[in-house]
Every structure is written in structure tokens, then in C-alpha cells.
């Protein structure tokens, strides 16, 4: 069983079409039997159409789990709950983002945004910093596909006191590398109080290969996925969240080049890691996250002098696993039973007040926000490989805010939370709009029956 990356072109469509439905149909027409998309992004859009990158699971008919879920399943929220202000912060993995494109370097942004939210829902790429994780206290650590499903309205999230975390690792040919991972689990037990549901070694291990797409984004390929899925399936009752640590094969010499690049090379590991965890969380409805294992102890102990600050967490870490264990420790439970969505302790799409993304990023979360009328704040300063004009998406007027930086984003978040029009605190201030309605002509049209009037069944019966 494979996880592969596919690039497809989808022609542009006329205005008024629901984009989620359009993309679902266009993608389905280009997939082979047994292929299921687990990850979707539009890397470039123009007058000719949309260049899309898909993470594809092959041989899905051999999966050990039951009914599969389409990543395009959508449920419109009927109301927005306004008793709390909850925001979602996303920095897509593997796109070379200025903030969040390396090792947890978007954590200060997450902590900043969390300061004006009741809850900040974010994902591993934002806060994972190898052996460091300083996510905000009111942050919810959620795998990327789970955020998509939350915004699509098909799942809810429930806070937990703690999770039983299963750790699945490669049975590494270098015994010391495996021992580092086991020690990391023990360290989490005695510092966090983590309930480790055990460490399972897989032999032969699942093969992960890091690659780059034509857009320059980090993607990859996974082989032997069925071995990992089988372990998770057989032990499903033993854990609440699953951490995976395994080698990621990269091009020869890239490891050294990456650390010496001054942050100019896109982190090669994240893309294939996201493909893997999207599959796990989608198939089993469990929180999941991945940490790369070193190729050998020489790599684990490699020294590169003073590196770019955004890469420094990797330079001071040898195991890269603690961030994952800390995140999964209290990652929220995934609720799929819609009968429970009205429970006061279940967070759903109705509870999301805003989505914050780098400018130009279009994937399921952005498209879902458009359909759910969730305000979106797009940050220009967080430059990345995506080439999309968000202004061309069918946002309801006043639901898209393009800002220069995350400091400005906090201002917009505060305005939304306070119920203050953003335009009211900007200058120049536009003139108040005044229009006229010719009521005599309107009433005449009613009298002549040119404008239909809704009549209740009771009133119709009286007539």
C-alpha cells in the first residue's frame, strides 16, 4: 500500500459554482480505482484553472478499517456560537513559509494569537520544534486533516484531561537511535506525566521518502503503509493518540545542505510526514503526529555551528520526538457522532470565529471557511510557495481580511471579537452609503401581482 503525490490541473469554472463540489468531481474523474485523496492543496490558480497537489492513498480496498470518509464531505453550519471566540491558525506544511516553515518557528505567533482567543486550534507544523514544544496553554494541538474536517463541519473536538499515547517506531538498524526514542517516551512519562501505552517497534519499517513537487513544496512517498495501519488497527482499544517515529529518506547530502542554507532550503521532512498523519487520523479518527528518526548516531550528533535561528531547535535536538509527545498528551478527542455536536463541551464548526492563514494558501480549510462564512485573515508577510489570489474566491463581503503581518492580524482578531467594524478604526473612512427606494412603484407592483408575496397556509385557508 502506497501514499503518493499527484499533480493535476483542473480547468477554471464559472462564477456561482460551489468550489468544494466542483473540485471533488474534477478530482474523482482523474483518479484510478482504489485511489483515495488524503490531502489537497491548490498551489497555483490563474485564468486557465487550478494547479492542484494531492496526497493519494492507493489500494484503499485492502484497508483493515471499515467505511472510508471523503475529504470533501461537508456539512453547512446553521449558526455561529458567539459565547466564545475561538480561532484556527494554519501554516500548511512544506510550503516554505517564512514563519512556520522550519522548526516550530511560528510558535510565538501562535502564542500571540492565543492571547486574544478563548481557544486557538492549531497543528503540529506550527509548534513542533524537535525536542521543544511551547504551544500556548489554551491551544488545541490537532492534526491537519482533523482541522479540515472540523471546518468542513463533519467532526467535533472534545477537550481531554490526558491521552494514552502509543508510540510506534522503526526497529532501527542502529540500536542507539531506537534507544533515543524509548528514552524520549520515558522522559515524557516522568515530566509530563504522560500515560505511554507502550512502544511498538516495526520490522521491516514503513518507508518514507521526502521529495519536492513542481511548485517547490515538500511532498513525498510512503511504502509499506499497511504494516503501520495493521499495528494501529489491532491495538486500537489500547490508546487514544498515536505518535510515529521513523526514518525519512532524503537526497544524499541534503541534510547538511539544509542546515547550512541559512533557512533558504524548504524543510524536506514535513510534507511526507503530513501525508502519513493525514492517513492515520482520517482512517482511525485519532490524534496523530510524526517525528523523524536520525539515519544514524553520526547524524543525530552532527554539529553545524551557529545555524539560522529558525532551525536552531533541530540543531540542539537529537531525538526530535518530545514535541510530538507533548502535543498528543492533551490533543482533543475527535467526535464523529453528530448527535453529540450540540453538547456544550464539544467544539464544532459553529464555534469557530476566524481562520488565520498565510496569504495565498488555498486548501480545504480555506474553501470550507468560504462556505461556512467564517472570516479569514490572510497574512502577507508569511511569504510561501503558494500562488493564489484569495480575493478571487467567493467570500461574502467583509469576510476576507488581507493584513501585512501577524501583529495586524491580532488587531483584526480583536476587532472581530469586540464586534467593531475594521473600517471604523482605519482612515480614510469611506462615506456613509445612502440609497433611495421608490416605494410607490414597489407598492404598485405588489398590487398588480408582479412581485409574489408569501402567504402562510393558515391565511390561504381563510381565503
Feature annotation, model-predicted:
Residues 136-145, 305-323, 393-405:
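Acidic, Ser/Thr-rich peripheral helices and adjacent loops at domain boundaries
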Residues 126-134, 207-211, 283-290, 395-401, ...:
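Noncatalytic linker/hinge segments flanking ATPase motor cores
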Residues 2-258, 262, 266-270, 448-458:
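Metallocofactor- and cofactor-centric catalytic cores in central/energy metabolism, strongly enriched
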Residues 108-112, 278, 415:
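Short, hydrophobic/amphipathic alpha-helical patches that form generic packing surfaces
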Residues 133-135, 256, 301-304, 389-391:
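Short secondary-structure transition/capping segments
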Residues 205-377:
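Long alpha-helical, hydrophobic tracts
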Residues 295-299, 319-352, 358-463:
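C-terminal functional extensions of proteins
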Amino acid at each position: 500500500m502506497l501514499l503518493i503525490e499527484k499533480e493535476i490541473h483542473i480547468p477554471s469554472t464559472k462564477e456561482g459554482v460551489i468550489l468544494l463540489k466542483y473540485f471533488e468531481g474534477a478530482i474523482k474523474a482523474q483518479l484510478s480505482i482504489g485511489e483515495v485523496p488524503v490531502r489537497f492543496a491548490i498551489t497555483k490558480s490563474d485564468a486557465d484553472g487550478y494547479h492542484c497537489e494531492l496526497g493519494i492513498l492507493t489500494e484503499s480496498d485492502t484497508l483493515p478499517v471499515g467505511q472510508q470518509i471523503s475529504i470533501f464531505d461537508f456539512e453547512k453550519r446553521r449558526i455561529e456560537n458567539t459565547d466564545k471566540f475561538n480561532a484556527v491558525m494554519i501554516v500548511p506544511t512544506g510550503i516554505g513559509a517564512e514563519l512556520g516553515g522550519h522548526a516550530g518557528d511560528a510558535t510565538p505567533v501562535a502564542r500571540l494569537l492565543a492571547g486574544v482567543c478563548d481557544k486557538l486550534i492549531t497543528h503540529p507544523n506550527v509548534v513542533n520544534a524537535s525536542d521543544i514544544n511551547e504551544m500556548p496553554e489554551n491551544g488545541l494541538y490537532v492534526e491537519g486533516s482533523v482541522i479540515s474536517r472540523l471546518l468542513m463541519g463533519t467532526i467535533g473536538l472534545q477537550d481531554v484531561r490526558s491521552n494514552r499515547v502509543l508510540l510506534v517506531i522503526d526497529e532501527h538498524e542502529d540500536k542507539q537511535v531506537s534507544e533515543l526514542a524509548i528514552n524520549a517516551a520515558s522522559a515524557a512519562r516522568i515530566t509530563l506525566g504522560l500515560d505511554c501505552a507502550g512502544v511498538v517497534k516495526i520490522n521491516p519499517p514503513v518507508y518514507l521518502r521526502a521529495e519536492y513537487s513542481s511548485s517547490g513544496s515538500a511532498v513525498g512517498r510512503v511504502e509499506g503503509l499497511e504494516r503501520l495501519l495493521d499495528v494501529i488497527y489491532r491495538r486500537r482499544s489500547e490508546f487514544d493518540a498515536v505518535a510515529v517515529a521513523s526514518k525519512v529518506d532524503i537526497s544524499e547530502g541534503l541534510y547538511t545542505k539544509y542546515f547550512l542554507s541559512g533557512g533558504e532550503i524548504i524543510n524536506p521532512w514535513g510534507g511526507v510526514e503530513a501525508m502519513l498523519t493525514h492517513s492515520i487520523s482520517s482512517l482511525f479518527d485519532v490524534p496523530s503526529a510524526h517525528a523523524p528518526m536520525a539515519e544514524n548516531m553520526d547524524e543525530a550528533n552532527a554539529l553545524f555551528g551557529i545555524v539560522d535561528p529558525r532551525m536552531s531547535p533541530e540543531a540542539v535536538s537529537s531525538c526530535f520526538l518530545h514535541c510530538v509527545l507533548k502535543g498528543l498528551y492533551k490533543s482533543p478527542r475527535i467526535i464523529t457522532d453528530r448527535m453529540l455536536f450540540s453538547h456544550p463541551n464539544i467544539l464544532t464548526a459553529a464555534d469557530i470565529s476566524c481562520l488565520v492563514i498565510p496569504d495565498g494558501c488555498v486548501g480545504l480549510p480555506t474553501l470550507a471557511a468560504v462556505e461556512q462564512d467564517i472570516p479569514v485573515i490572510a497574512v502577507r508577510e508569511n511569504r510561501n510557495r503558494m500562488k493564489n489570489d484569495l480575493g478571487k474566491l467567493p467570500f461574502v463581503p467583509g469576510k476576507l481580511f488581507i493584513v501585512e503581518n501577524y501583529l495586524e492580524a491580532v488587531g483584526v482578531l480583536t476587532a472581530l471579537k469586540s464586534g467593531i467594524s475594521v473600517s471604523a478604526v482605519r482612515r480614510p473612512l469611506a462615506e456613509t452609503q445612502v440609497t433611495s427606494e421608490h416605494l410607490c412603484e414597489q407598492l404598485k407592483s405588489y398590487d398588480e401581482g408582479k412581485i409574489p408575496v408569501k402567504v402562510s397556509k393558515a391565511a390561504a385557508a381563510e381565503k
